[in-house]
Amino acid sequence: KKSIEMELPLFAGFYESDGYYFLVFGQNNMDESDTVEVIRVVKYDKSWNKLGAAQIFGANTQKPFASGNVSMADDGTNLYLRTCHTMYKADDGYNHQASIMMQISIADMKVIYNNYTVSNTSHGYVSHSFSQDIFYDDSTGTVYATDRGDAYPRSHVLMKYTNLGSEYFSSKTANVTIMSYGGETGDNYTGSYVSGLEVTGSTILSAGCSIDQSNYSSSTKRNVYVAVVDKSGYKLDKIVNLSAYAEDGTDNALRPWLVRVSDDVFAVLWETDISKRQVHYAFVDARGNILASERVVSGTLSDMKPIVKGGSII
């Protein structure tokens, strides 16, 4: 057991690569100063000896990680990090929230790319962005990311980065709309959660739960789904529903987790009421075919992604 001191007031995430551990810290920048360190990514060896850090100053950031999370992936050479922030005050007097995408060289922890400015989805920018997931596909050298946006775009969106290693990710991202949301542009309520991104040999899987968006104004019950995107054609193949909770029922899905069990088996876990202390789960294959329909066991989920260890999901 070893205690690691907080390097900045906010702790935002942990990631393990083949050779290193990474911790992400941050601090608010209420004066909007370009000299304030807002994000620090610290590299450790597997004995938790500190080896280096990437430090981000200013970066158009008032509050790092605000209303979102941190997701990381690596290709052995680079660490890719997707998160979010509230930005410096805009001309309209508001501090708008949006996604951030970073690429960091693992060897020297140099920040190679940091997209923190106002942009659009053709450059992987989402605003507001309320959940972020990232995955590196080593078979194609591609980074995929998903976000839950409430305005630009107002959807569960998948993005693909192919020109990695360049200073500015100079090629534009290719985007797939997985699910469009009802309501007005910028309305924070979307009736949905998005959590989980996995890439297989032929597909990209992303999990979520949502109200019936076609009845946005009246629907209140969220159901769990897995979206299947064809990797070769890069288009949405289908959305597979894993629950069927009725509007007049008591069950209402909370944030699901997508967990890779093997190359062709994926678990989706969720809760409907934290007080019940029950975990719902189902299994699908790489094409989204249901291998085992919804079942329930005693337990609870944390805000950390479950992992597979010793033949069990924990």
Where are these regions (language model features)?
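Extracellular, repeat-based ectodomains that mediate carbohydrate processing or recognition
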Residues: 1-314
